[in-house]
């Protein structure tokens, strides 16, 4: 889809699953150290009911999924940030619940802002992302 065809309010959805193998690959690549991942018996004592996925792993997978959607296949994408930029209405990244390896997730990408560049054939899209676990319909 070309930049000019995107409209504020458009919504695109996809489903993803991050399994235990994906989790191990992420931990190996990111070199993430977290006692809840390294000591499952301690995690279980703390009420963790499985392989808890790191938030950054979820963000990476959700961003990667967006690049594979046909709608964005002709786009150059950059992650500008998730830090409450006042130009983007101070949006932040926050998780509302836990995600475990094997959870099936629905990811909703919505175009929340569009700023045209000089030629009108390119510009910046702001994409809001919401994640929902399919099994219990919980927003994450």
Regions found by a protein language model. Name each.
Residues 1-11, 95-140:
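HotDog/MaoC-like acyl-thioester-processing domains
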Residues 1-88:
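Hot-dog-fold acyl-thioester-processing enzymes
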Residues 88-94:
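A beta-strand/beta-hairpin structural motif
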């Amino acid at each position: 889809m070309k930049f000019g065809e995107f409209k504020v309010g458009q919504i695109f959805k996809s489903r993803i699953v991050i399994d235990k193998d994906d989790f191990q690959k992420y931990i190996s690549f990111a070199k993430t150290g977290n006692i809840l991942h390294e000591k499952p018996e301690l995690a279980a004592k703390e009420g963790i009911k499985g392989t808890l996925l790191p938030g950054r792993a979820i963000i990476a997978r959700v961003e990667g999924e967006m690049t594979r959607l046909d709608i964005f296949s002709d786009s150059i994408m950059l992650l500008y940030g998730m830090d409450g930029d006042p130009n983007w209405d101070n949006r932040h990244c926050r998780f509302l619940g836990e995600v475990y390896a094997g959870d099936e997730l629905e990811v909703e990408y919505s175009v929340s802002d569009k700023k045209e560049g000089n030629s009108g054939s390119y510009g910046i899209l702001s994409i809001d992302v919401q994640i929902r676990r399919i099994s219990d319909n919980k927003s994450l």
